[in-house]
Amino acid sequence: MRQANWLVSCEQWPHFQGGFGQYFYLRPNHAMFVLPPEITDEMTAGVNCAYTQVYAGLDIAGLKAGQTVVVQGAGGLGVYACAVAREMGAGRVIVIDGIDERLELARQFGADTFVDLREFTTPEARVKRVKELTDNWGGDVVLELVGHPGVVDERLRMTAPEGTYLEIGNINVGWKAEFDPSWIIFGNRRIIGLAHYEAEHLRGALDLMLRTLTKYPWRKVVSHKYPLEEINRAFAEQDKGHVTRAAIMPN
């Protein structure tokens, strides 16, 4: 089952295993779920690569009721993380970002406290602010969803003793991060990297979405739609940070 759900290059036979394709090959034992009519295609566009990843990450991290979750980055992954953390019982959800529309959407998805990058402009200031908001404790679970190695040390320093640093954003091979490993050891902290998840995580994520359809604005996560011939513009505008999640509409 693990092999069935693992990434395989589209260069390998039978090739139809990548995005933006007309066909997709399902290997033996590949898990599939039938969507209820209440969940639209638009709402599920980010379920596989975003929503279920943060669901699985918070589940594996062992988030407990009343704990504090810190979310770095309020893009698609970040706003999903806010709702999942809230539904898993987080007592406080702190979001770090600097774009108004992203901060507002995060609020609609359950975030209650914000660290604005335009106000807290240095790593030291942001770490200090998170500590102030948590009685000098830090986040019990801290999610890195930005995808830049320069934030790794900063996120670790705002992770509480016996807390979990959840790394989902840094997917670029070859990039390096520098941090003090003693911070992990003396605080009994742990680092979890996550890209893949089990079928039960997808089931749980879909169930959560279904039961909270009127609580969170799931339809707003896909903020921009592009025809297939404008796919390059979609990527360019996504990189600017003002597109929460882009959808490519086939002809």
Label each residue range with its predicted role.
Residues 1-32:
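Glycine-rich phosphate/adenylate-binding loop and adjacent beta-alpha elements
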Residues 38-40, 62-68, 136-137:
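Short helix-loop-beta connector
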Residues 168-169:
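Acidic carboxylate diad motif detector
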